[in-house]
């Protein structure tokens, strides 16, 4: 930074809250926060001056080896602050003055640097901190609200800082130029509510979800991480994804989360300096996990059988019922499954004497287009018995045109295609049988009590071992040339044999996963509190 003088006015009598400047905000006094921010911004402590009316604040300045001026009669307001400050700094040689106040504690040294760089671009101007305002204003005509006037070009001054040159102010010929502070940092402490909000924001931790998903891999990891992120409201949540996974980035962005698309995930994550990193990327490597841990973050992995898992703080392998690796940091099986939020209020099915609707669903992408294959297999059975066919496919399903063409040409019209819908549970609640892939959807089917035929997309899915007959599933395995005959046989039996279907229904109805997510998120967030206590 150029040799400017940073002046921190700290007037005790002007405080909105008693002893505001020496009151601890998240463990650090307001004046000390301002000093720390100024020190991070300045080249050295000699560039900082505190002017105050308080003995306590003068002592704090001394302890920080910062110059101060104390005047018990000092009083400042928005109209006189610049002139009063100028009168107190006449002996200082610096021409550029950065008047920085302590009552906006969310503003950091990077914000001050950006503001000063902007100031250096100006001539004959004073830079003023402001925040944007959007106003929807109505006039009243004959006691009624008239047409509103929407204003998006407004801004409001906040008392964070002024930057000016002595000579410009003395000549009294200058313009006031706005420097816009982002909304999330523009809170000015004027009352206890402002204090409470600032403290809550400062206490937030940074949680980074490292995820992937595309046509080949599927979107299960994305939807799983989103369901967890929805439960984390007291901390900052950021998603990091390799830029090649465009489908994943688009899905996350649609949920209004901050998502960083990058070619170098490791560097991006380290630069973010997270308090907690959640990896939902399958098998991790040792070096990657060690680097994150060395950077001070706690690490939680999902569905991880890689060597990096041994070095994580928690590893949830919820899709595997039997432990495959040893370690106290591993958690196995369906009691660690978390369902999407829509299932929180979904109603599990009661047993129905006959089958009126069937569900086909093979994940968000269905790279093998099992959807169309299964539709062709069961169509004649459904048509003969007047069974409605519900097809659910995700936003990444690239065979949509093919299946729409097939449906349009079919003589049977009780076929419904639900593409990228947000309420799959509603379709499930109408269905008595399902045919599905062996991903996370099997737990959703179990939650709604739907006996299901399961076909695995690939070997990794095949190794997921929850979907067994003892839990109400008919697991066909991976698709082979004999799969068509097996599916037709098992589907016909489910439709025709009520006792067989009832037996499977009783088995599957024993399971509920609704409470799991809260417990999992609580366990994950406890790591942050633990790391906070240790530090």
What are these regions (language model features)?
Residues 480-511, 530:
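Conserved donor-nucleotide binding/catalytic region of nucleotide-linked donor-dependent transferases
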Residues 1-18:
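N-terminal nucleotide-binding beta1-loop-alpha1 segment
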Residues 3, 118, 191, 513-535:
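C-terminal alpha-helical cap of glycosyltransferases
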Residues 429-440:
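Acidic donor-binding loop of glycosyltransferase active sites
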Residues 78-84, 105-184:
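Conserved core of the sugar-phosphate nucleotidyltransferase
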Residues 172, 176-197, 312-369, 399-401:
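A nucleotide-sugar donor-handling region in carbohydrate enzymes
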Residues 245, 357-430:
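Donor-nucleotide binding loops and adjacent catalytic segments primarily
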Residues 49, 55-99, 106-114, 261-273, ...:
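Short phosphate-binding loop-to-helix
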């Amino acid at each position: 930074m150029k040799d400017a003088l940073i002046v921190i006015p700290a007037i005790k009598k002007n405080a909105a809250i008693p002893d505001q400047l020496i009151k601890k905000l998240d463990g650090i006094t307001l004046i000390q926060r301002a000093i720390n921010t100024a020190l991070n911004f300045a080249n050295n402590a000699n560039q900082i001056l505190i002017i105050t009316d308080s003995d306590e604040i003068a002592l704090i300045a001394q302890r920080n080896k910062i110059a101060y001026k104390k005047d018990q009669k000092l009083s400042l307001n928005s109209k006189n602050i610049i002139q009063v400050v100028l009168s107190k700094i006449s002996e200082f040689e610096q021409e550029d003055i950065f008047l920085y106040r302590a009552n906006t504690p969310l503003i950091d040294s990077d914000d001050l640097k950006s503001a000063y760089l902007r100031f250096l671009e100006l001539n004959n101007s004073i830079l003023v901190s402001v925040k944007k305002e959007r106003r929807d204003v109505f006039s009243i005509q004959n006691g009624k609200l008239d047409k509103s006037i929407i204003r998006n070009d407004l801004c409001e001054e906040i008392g964070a800082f002024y930057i000016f040159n002595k000579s410009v102010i003395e000549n009294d010929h200058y313009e006031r130029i706005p420097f816009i502070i982002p909304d999330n940092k523009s809170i000015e402490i004027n009352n206890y509510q402002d204090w409470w909000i600032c403290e809550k924001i400062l206490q937030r931790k940074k949680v980074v979800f490292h995820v992937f998903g595309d046509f080949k891999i599927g979107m299960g990891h994305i939807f799983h991480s989103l369901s967890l992120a929805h439960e984390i409201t007291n901390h900052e949540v950021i998603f990091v994804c390799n830029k090649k996974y465009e489908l994943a980035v688009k899905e996350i962005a649609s949920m209004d989360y901050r998502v960083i698309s990058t070619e170098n995930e490791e560097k991006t994550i380290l630069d973010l300096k997270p308090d907690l990193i959640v990896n939902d990327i399958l098998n991790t490597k040792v070096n990657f996990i060690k680097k994150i841990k060395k950077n001070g973050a706690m690490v939680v992995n999902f569905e991880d059988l890689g060597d990096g898992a041994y070095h994580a703080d928690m590893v949830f392998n919820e899709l595997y019922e039997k432990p495959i690796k040893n370690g106290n940091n591993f958690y196995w099986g369906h009691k660690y499954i978390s369902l999407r939020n829509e299932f929180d209020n979904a109603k599990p099915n009661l047993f129905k004497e006959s089958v009126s609707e069937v569900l086909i669903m093979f994940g968000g992408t269905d790279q093998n287009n099992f959807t169309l294959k299964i539709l062709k297999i069961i169509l004649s059975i459904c048509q003969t018995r007047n069974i409605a066919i519900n097809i659910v496919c995700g936003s990444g399903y690239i065979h949509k045109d093919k299946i729409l063409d097939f449906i349009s040409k079919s003589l049977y019209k009780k076929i419904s295609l639900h593409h990228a819908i947000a309420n799959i549970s509603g379709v499930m609640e109408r269905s008595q049988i399902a045919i599905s892939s062996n991903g996370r959807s099997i737990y959703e089917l179990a939650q709604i009590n739907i006996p299901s035929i399961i076909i695995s997309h690939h070997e990794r899915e095949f190794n997921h071992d929850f979907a067994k007959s003892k839990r109400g599933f008919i697991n066909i395995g991976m698709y082979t040339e004999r799969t068509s005959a097996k599916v037709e046989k098992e589907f016909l039996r489910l439709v025709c044999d009520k006792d067989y279907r009832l037996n499977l229904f009783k088995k599957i109805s024993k399971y509920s996963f609704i409470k799991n997510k809260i417990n999992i998120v609580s366990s994950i967030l406890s790591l942050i509190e633990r790391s906070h206590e240790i530090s």
